[in-house]
Amino acid sequence: MKLVSTWLLVLVVLLCGKRHLGDRLGTRALEKAPCPSCSHLTLKVEFSSTVVEYEYIVAFNGYFTAKARNSFISSALKSSEVENWRIIPRNNPSSDYPSDFEVIQIKEKQKAGLLTLEDHPNIKRVTPQRKVFRSLKFAESNPIVPCNETRWSQKWQSSRPLKRASLSLGSGFWHATGRHSSRRLLRAIPRQVAQTLQADVLWQMGYTGANVRVAVFDTGLSEKHPHFKNVKERTNWTNERTLDDGLGHGTFVAGVIASMRECQGFAPDAELHIFRVFTNNQVSYTSWFLDAFNYAILKKMDVLNLSIGGPDFMDHPFVDKVWELTANNVIMVSAIGNDGPLYGTLNNPADQMDVIGVGGIDFEDNIARFSSRGMTTWELPGGYGRVKPDIVTYGAGVRGSGVKGGCRALSGTSVASPVVAGAVTLLVSTVQKRELVNPASVKQALIASARRLPGVNMFEQGHGKLDLLRAYQILSSYKPQASLSPSYIDLTECPYMWPYCSQPIYYGGMPTIVNVTILNGMGVTGRIVDKPEWRPYLPQNGDNIEVAFSYSSVLWPWSGYLAISISVTKKAASWEGIAQGHIMITVASPAETELHSGAEHTSTVKLPIKVKIIPTPPRSKRVLWDQYHNLRYPPGYFPRDNLRMKNDPLDWNGDHVHTNFRDMYQHLRSMGYFVEVLGAPFTCFDATQYGTLLLVDSEEEYFPEEIAKLRRDVDNGLSLVIFSDWYNTSVMRKVKFYDENTRQWWMPDTGGANIPALNELLSVWNMGFSDGLYEGEFVLANHDMYYASGCSIAKFPEDGVVITQTFKDQGLEVLKQETAVVENVPILGLYQIPSEGGGRIVLYGDSNCLDDSHRQKDCFWLLDALLQYTSYGVTPPSLSHSGNRQRPPSGAGLAPPERMEGNHLHRYSKVLEAHLGDPKPRPLPACPHLSWAKPQPLNETAPSNLWKHQKLLSIDLDKVVLPNFRSNRPQVRPLSPGESGAWDIPGGIMPGRYNQEVGQTIPVFAFLGAMVALAFFVVQISKAKSRPKRRRPRAKRPQLAQQAHPARTPSV
């Protein structure tokens, strides 16, 4: 029995040890237990870049040796009499190969030297050298993860040196994941992202990323890191003599892609090529990236992960090199940015058509608050942005490799990017015909297989959540073809098709523009054969709409655009209903093989269209938003509208009703107004169709013809509402910044708004703004308001209504750090044109209350009241009888604000052009003219449901069956039309959680069962050994003897 007790004790110890071991296996990255009293550290990453003084990147129109490049530059500069120049040496692995650029330093006569260089026939472009900074900052956060674990979070930076404030990704994660605080502990546990996305299914099929070359552009990697077994090459592109990662970010990214143990990556057998492009001080240069990109092309990389970016999509050397990379069959994956939830905050290069742009979600499939939103802003003001991100995946609380081993958790889209890069690497290794793999085909597979998230629009989720197994199914039977993104246009489908679905179309309205991306998996170059064809469905009233096309003449690299303008025909001016049709386009690409020299591959794609038409609304309900006169960064330095926001120096979100004025647009739609966007001069719209023209935060100048036309329009009934912003040349000089590293000044090209231009526009009505700069809280009509860096009204007609307030003089505070209070500052003016049938004019000195960027208190109620006044002539009693109403200022004795001497606005203006002396207006451009496509009517019924997963040709997901390695693994099944995209799993368990949590319990139960069986056999053996042997019977002892030795009773 003692032996039995001993074995039972051993069993108990083993079971307890197994339970403890299971806990350790479930939380291998947690080196210590959570301690509520400890603070959790969040690592914030910020990016910025500056122009390096005297240094320029000379881009050639081909690849040349160092001797030839030197010869070209020398011969070009001889004629310019520039003597003090030199070529900056670049000692890196690509210096032994021909290059397409050189970095030079010119310290005298820069302008003459640059012009002479650009005139050389072998030189394509000369641009300034840029210095990139990345800073890492630790901040305390909620103590939800263990004390010793550091969660990283990244904040991207604009391409100017004043740093943007980092969003707190920890708090943003909680805002995004739901409302049930009792579930936070579950969400706080970092997940094994590879298993969550079911990469282990492909591993068990024998696919582990072997023979796929992956480039990781980051902070390097230690040589003997225990998580990696196939680091093929490490290269250093910095000025530091080390290849190791001294910060950990590059190690984490590489681990998500290819770690082989602990926090396992997607492709452990992939060939890792580590490009160290950041120093330990987090400094990099554009030239370092260009050299590294050239080397990646030379080494024939298959996949490249780039977890950095910024808003400067006009950084030509960088953008051009990204195009060249993808043209050389490098699949680039890049993070979309961490500037959410604001719209219009996409980062480059992820916003390029040929790059896979990745957004972030949490492990409950909610869009991460920090993830940047679309649309792209390249196309403004004349066009409309594209759908981005392309896909979303896990980017909050993801586990990856620590710098010295172990695991750590990070958050940010720079985390989501390597998740997709690792998935792509694994997918590429599954393709037998590797020649079918290219940036377009992989992107086609990812977006066609993505799972749509319910209740989220396309500018937040792109095509949906990454689905690794469905992407594998598609690539397994892929045939080269063209496809479209988005694959259909349904202006009635909300919320996915927001903002298109938020407003029906009608006759006389501005054409609705949909920007579709063409992906060409047949070749790096292609073209659209003939013209796109418009085929309306007659039974579905397709003849009530007309369409026009604008498209890429050449599809390169791997992609192009198809802009579709949709309008309503005159016969449907009073009609209401749904109209449908489809567009057919044929894409052709040259055959790549020598056997088919001169031949072409073709692919025909159908684009369904569905729109809702209503009768033309009354003029009073139609508001026209002026987009043409809004300027942004890039390319110019247009400063922020709220000077308090020192951490966000640039006005870079597009100032569009679907980007940083989204909430205002939503509010106007909820109030019954129809908002249209003008992307052309004032001479290009019919003012009789609109009740109010809305000018908000305008930075552009005005053509003289525009000023004259607007005066006529207002006299004939058009109303004008202007929300201005600050403008003060002294303050502009003050908010210029001096970069200590480059010793260069950056000067704003205008103020928050262009007050001199607005005053010229308003001068015919004796109105104008001042260059005063004011700030403060106040109450107007029982509403709390905040005036953020606004200007005042300098003059206004005597018979107008003017509202004043008491504010702080922010201009004095900025210039002299002194505080002063100014009473009776005119901020709001209302005026009725006296002529019969005349319109009304409203001026307000601050637009921040409408702008989503840094709004503290909205003034949507005020906009409602002003539109009631401009549309119906009803002056709000709360304003006309306000105690703050004062006599309108006459402007006497006040000098009007002047344009700042030496400004460079003409470089970025659509109105001004450079001229000797002051810039002069350009000739007025012609108004856009649309050529409507000739319809080819179809007498057939349109499909009832346009939303299907983008079926690529010759691919049937039902026929591609995945092996069932585990009997309890949920199987992937194709979506039927109209489904929400959820997995079909009994009990509603998400597949990632099922595999990770339930799957990990199987070995525990197996171990317990083995221990129970072992204990059973041990007990049986012990019983057998302790059983007494049979003995021969003996004669009984005398009774006396028995009484002398009484039996012992067992003690309990």
From Swiss-Prot:
Its cofactor is Ca(2+). Pfam families: MBTP1_N, MBTPS1_3rd, MBTPS1_4th, Peptidase_S8. Glycans are attached at N148, N236, N305, N515, N728, N939. The chain crosses the membrane at residues 1000-1022. The active site is at D218, H249, S414. The modification Phosphoserine is found at S168. Residues 877-900, 1026-1052 are annotated as: Disordered. Residues 1023-1052 are cytoplasmic. Inhibited by divalent copper and zinc ions, but not by nickel or cobalt. Inhibited by its prosegment, but not smaller fragments. Inhibited by 4-(2-aminoethyl)benzenesulfonyl fluoride (AEBSF), a serine protease inhibitor. Residues 1026-1037 have a biased composition (Basic residues). Serine protease that cleaves after hydrophobic or small residues, provided that Arg or Lys is in position P4: known substrates include SREBF1/SREBP1, SREBF2/SREBP2, BDNF, GNPTAB, ATF6, ATF6B and FAM20C. Cleaves substrates after Arg-Ser-Val-Leu (SREBP2), Arg-His-Leu-Leu (ATF6), Arg-Gly-Leu-Thr (BDNF) and its own propeptide after Arg-Arg-Leu-Leu. Catalyzes the first step regulated intramembrane proteolysis activation of the sterol regulatory element-binding proteins (SREBPs) SREBF1/SREBP1 and SREBF2/SREBP2. SUPFAM superfamilies: Subtilisin-like. Its main location: endoplasmic reticulum. InterPro entries: MBTP1_N, MBTPS1_3rd, MBTPS1_4th, Peptidase_S8/S53_dom, Peptidase_S8/S53_dom_sf, Peptidase_S8_His-AS, Peptidase_S8_Ser-AS, Peptidase_S8_subtilisin-like. The record marks L186, R187 as: Cleavage. PROSITE patterns: SUBTILASE, SUBTILASE_HIS, SUBTILASE_SER. This is Membrane-bound transcription factor site-1 protease. Residues 877-887 have a biased composition (Polar residues). Residues 18-186 form a propeptide. Residues 1-17 form the signal peptide. It catalyses: Processes precursors containing basic and hydrophobic/aliphatic residues at P4 and P2, respectively, with a relatively relaxed acceptance of amino acids at P1 and P3.
